């Protein structure tokens, strides 16, 4: 029985899941919007939201924690230099999930996951 076991398995073993969400979190921080399946988007929230909360208070210890979770210095720099200050006044809820139909090959439900306070120029670039 899987009572009280949180998180989705997504038909992957734990190391594959960890690597996938590490890559997806990096892509979301870098591009501020990504398209993925709905279950992956919902699970990605649980990875990205704590990273942004961590980035709101800039310290060496927090930067090292963020690096341990992302393994990418470019992502850590963007988290602490751009996203942390941008979301300083927001108490959680940094991401938005928008459903966008079904994938052509296997009819999987697809969704965009984006950071809520994206600038208008980035939104226009993503739409193109």
UniProtKB/Swiss-Prot annotation:
GO process annotations (BP): translation
GO CC term (a single one): cytosolic large ribosomal subunit
A GO term for molecular function: structural constituent of ribosome
One of the Pfam families matching this protein, by short name: Ribosomal_L17
Keyword Ribosomal protein: yes
Top-rank lineage group of the source organism: Bacteria
Protein family: Belongs to the bacterial ribosomal protein bL17 family.
Oligomer and partners: Part of the 50S ribosomal subunit. Contacts protein L32.
Protein name: Large ribosomal subunit protein bL17
Organism, as annotated: Edwardsiella ictaluri (strain 93-146)
């Amino acid at each position: 029985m899987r009572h009280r076991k949180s998180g989705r398995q997504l038909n992957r073993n734990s190391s594959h899941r960890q690597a996938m969400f590490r890559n997806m979190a990096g892509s979301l921080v870098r591009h501020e919007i990504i398209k993925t399946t709905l279950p992956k988007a919902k699970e990605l929230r649980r990875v990205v939201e704590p990273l942004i909360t961590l980035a709101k208070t800039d310290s060496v210890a927090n930067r090292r924690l963020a690096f341990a979770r992302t393994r990418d210095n470019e992502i850590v720099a963007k988290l602490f230099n751009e996203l942390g200050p941008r979301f300083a006044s927001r108490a959680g809820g940094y991401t938005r999930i928008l459903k966008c139909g079904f994938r052509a090959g296997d009819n999987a439900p697809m969704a965009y996951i984006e950071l809520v306070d994206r600038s208008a120029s980035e939104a226009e670039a993503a739409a193109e």
